[in-house]
């Protein structure tokens, strides 16, 4: 399937995830208490940051996942929900979170796309059968507004994802390297001044 692009509707999903938050504070009576269902309906009407990584227990991936975790409150302040997805199962996600110091208190769900249906529908399932390192910003109307895919060896810039979200939410024309609080471009003034 082709890579989703700007204006496409983000696919529906109903997947299992490791709950967000400090795993040591989960009131777990049984192993299943660490897991939850995550569906596309859960965040209807909200901005979503949905990012994919290739594999758990690797080297670049935890740096990115932890970076999204550190900025989660900033995304929440912008009424945006973060979801991280890979094709690993929920038990692998759980073990990785439990063992990796930077992931133990991850505030958002780690989603398992074991059947690879969402990964394929987004167009980021690669020839190795795992997800490409991809990021989607999806608006409250479920429309893709930003797509980024990097090589497996190159981690993404989470600050840039936040910057782009700010620009998209400004609903204005934003120049190169624009940051929240910077002036936006007034095309009307520019056109009037050119005549």
UniProtKB/Swiss-Prot annotation:
UniProt-listed Gene3D superfamilies: Glutaredoxin (3.40.30.10)
Coiled-coil portions: none
Broadest EC class assigned to this enzyme: oxidoreductase
Transmembrane annotation, as ranges: none
GO BP terms: cell redox homeostasis; cellular response to stress; hydrogen peroxide catabolic process; response to oxidative stress
Main localization of the protein described in the UniProt heading: cytoplasm
Active site: residue positions: 61 (cysteine sulfenic acid (-soh) intermediate)
Source superkingdom: Bacteria
SUPFAM superfamilies hit by this protein: Thioredoxin-like (SSF52833)
Localisation per UniProt entry: Cytoplasm
Keyword line: Antioxidant, Cytoplasm, Disulfide bond, Isopeptide bond, Oxidoreductase, Peroxidase, Redox-active center, Stress response, Ubl conjugation
GO molecular function annotations of the record: thioredoxin peroxidase activity
GO terms under cellular component: cytosol
Note: The active site is a conserved redox-active cysteine residue, the peroxidatic cysteine (C(P)), which makes the nucleophilic attack on the peroxide substrate. The peroxide oxidizes the C(P)-SH to cysteine sulfenic acid (C(P)-SOH), which then reacts with another cysteine residue, the resolving cysteine (C(R)), to form a disulfide bridge. The disulfide is subsequently reduced by an appropriate electron donor to complete the catalytic cycle. In this typical 2-Cys peroxiredoxin, C(R) is provided by the other dimeric subunit to form an intersubunit disulfide.
Descriptive protein name: Alkyl hydroperoxide reductase C
